């Protein structure tokens, strides 16, 4: 069983504290495997291998654009999180899967999750040997006209409630997307769609991946993403489509279920998972648990999937 919480728009520090709480509870086997989905306000995170020189912008410029900076314990270099980007934080005990997973196998599964999401939007994506993340290799410029490789596109979900309503008890804002300025980016054949950076402590994972959906790609001009000079792209830039984060979240949750051979259970509230005394350090409101409409609660049950 993997329990899913949608935190909606949530500042990085709050989401990080929640991760840390869940990691400790997972180590004690007091919570199941948990998958957090979140959209962050603009923020740069620096992993253990980060070089400050990969932040190109001055601190003054970052402040003027409302970009926070956090140094964290995940692997990797510097990356950007912001509106229009789907971030996933799996809090998994790798020993709970059959067969149990090693760190490399786990990262490869995250890459496979991302590649299958991209395939849903008819984007051909691949790994690059010696690197972590998911890339697209195109022989023609990306389409910006709303048509994707000759295939019709129908949104999978436009729901604003149910399992995709931000779970109460952490952050209450709905997921939104920002306009993109990706048209300014020069076409190249090799572009990065998603970044991965994880941390594993006593077999329990934290941090995860960030998939650019409708992200304003100009923010990546502030850094050398992951210490690489290769360009960054998004689902919107590649296809001309603007799927909601809720829609992509639905695809992601089902794909996690398939690849990790687990039931996926959407939760209404953080308090469905963590006793109230354990949420004090996350600055979480404790008095307004979310209650989804009955039809959306039915969707949540339908999303329980056993591969």
What kind of feature is each model-predicted range?
Residues 91, 198, 235-237:
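Short, well-ordered beta-strand elements within core beta-sheets of diverse protein domains
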Residues 198-204, 275-278:
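Short, active-site-adjacent segments that bind or coordinate small-molecule cofactors and metal centers
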Residues 193-196:
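Histidine/acidic-rich helix-loop-helix segments that form or flank divalent-metal centers
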Residues 214-260:
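A hydrophobic, small-residue-rich beta->alpha segment in the mid-to-C-terminal subdomain
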Residues 269:
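Catalytic cores of Mg2+-dependent Asp-rich isoprenoid enzymes
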Residues 1-165, 170-190, 218, 243, ...:
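N-terminal lobe of the biotin/lipoate ligase/transferase fold
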Residues 39-41, 200, 213-215:
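Residues immediately flanking
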Residues 79, 202-214:
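Conserved phosphate/anionic-ligand binding catalytic regions in large, soluble enzymes, centered on
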């Amino acid at each position: 069983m993997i329990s899913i919480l949608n935190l909606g728009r949530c500042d990085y520090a709050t989401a990080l504290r929640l991760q840390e709480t869940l990691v400790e509870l997972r180590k004690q086997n007091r919570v199941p495997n948990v998958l957090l989905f979140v959209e962050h306000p603009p923020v740069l995170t620096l992993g253990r291998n980060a070089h400050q020189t990969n932040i190109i912008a001055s601190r003054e410029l970052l402040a003027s654009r409302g970009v926070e900076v956090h140094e964290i314990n995940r692997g990797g270099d510097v990356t950007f999180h912001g509106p229009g980007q789907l971030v996933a934080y799996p809090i998994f005990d790798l020993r709970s899967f059959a067969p149990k997973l090693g760190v490399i196998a786990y990262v490869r599964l995250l890459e496979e999750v991302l590649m299958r999401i991209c395939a849903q939007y008819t984007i051909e994506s691949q790994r690059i040997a010696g690197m972590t993340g998911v890339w697209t290799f195109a022989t023609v410029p990306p389409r910006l006209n709303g048509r994707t490789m000759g295939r019709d596109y129908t949104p999978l979900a436009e729901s604003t409630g149910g399992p995709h309503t931000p779970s109460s008890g952490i952050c209450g804002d709905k997921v939104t997307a920002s306009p993109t300025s990706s048209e300014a980016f020069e076409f190249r054949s090799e572009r990065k769609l998603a970044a991965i950076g994880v941390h594993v402590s006593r077999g329990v994972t934290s941090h995860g991946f960030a998939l650019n959906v409708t992200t304003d790609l100009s923010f990546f001009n502030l850094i050398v993403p992951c210490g690489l000079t290769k360009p960054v792209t998004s689902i919107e830039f590649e296809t001309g489509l603007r799927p909601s984060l809720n829609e992509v979240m639905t695809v992601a949750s089902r794909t996690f279920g398939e690849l990790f051979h687990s039931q996926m259970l959407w939760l209404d509230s953080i308090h469905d998972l963590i006793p109230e005394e354990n949420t004090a350090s996350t600055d979480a409101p404790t008095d307004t648990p979310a209650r989804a409409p009955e039809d959306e609660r039915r969707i949540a049950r339908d999303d329980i999937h056993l591969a």
